Amino acid sequence: MNRARLIDFWEAAPETRHFVFEADGPVDFLPGQFVSVVAELEGKHITRAYSIAAPPNGARFDLCLNRVDGGIISPYLFSLAPGGEIEWKGPFGVFVWRKPVSDSILVATGTGITPYRSMLLERLPLEPDRHFTLVFGARHEEGLIYRAEFEDLAGRYPNFRFLPTLTRPTGSWAGRTGRVQSHVFEVLGERRDVDVYICGMAAMIDDLRNSLKEKGLDRKKIIVEKYD
């Protein structure tokens, strides 16, 4: 089992927090992977998996998660002050860039956005000739985690587009509305040579994956990470 200290945190959205931890030594992982945080309850070890939210940075790793009412791990993490410690295992996971990296559409809802922060911050400076589009769905505007950061990246990298969409917009919202699925097909058009990464809840993923296959996209071009 590994240990890590909380060194910083901030509110990423209502009831959603970004955590920065520092381990005892270097943490080697690929952007898109996750770690498992461990807690003990009634003599049993309970684990929860959380995607890493930043590229490799020595001994540090970032997580972003919702507070879950009645949960076990998330209330403990939200109670931590800087200097507090966690036990963790990993990294794990295969939700990473396919090689060679192709033009890609990245799709997320909720905290499914987390691995893309790690993946894009690492990859955009390295792939000026590849085009990346991030389609991110939330219910409300305040739920668009990392919105300002992705808008900044879109302004700095001409090969990156950020397309947020809301399912329950307020009257002040002038952007896209509706589920992510419809906007994915707007971006995809007639192309079938792009990789489509999908991260979020199982129902959204299954629906979109089935629709993509019906449209003729090879199943090997669809890479998924389910959060439930």
Identify the meaning behind each predicted range.
Residues 2, 131, 135, 140-228:
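Reductase modules of NAD(P)H-dependent flavoproteins
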Residues 89-101:
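A short, basic/flexible loop-to-alpha-helix module at the beginning of a structural domain
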Residues 113-125:
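Histidine-anchored nucleotide/phosphate-binding helix
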Residues 49-59, 98-110, 215:
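Short, compositionally biased
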Residues 2-82, 139-140, 167-168:
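Ferredoxin-reductase
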Residues 32, 112, 201:
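Short, conserved phosphate/pyrophosphate- and ester-handling motifs at nucleotide-, phospho-/glycolipid
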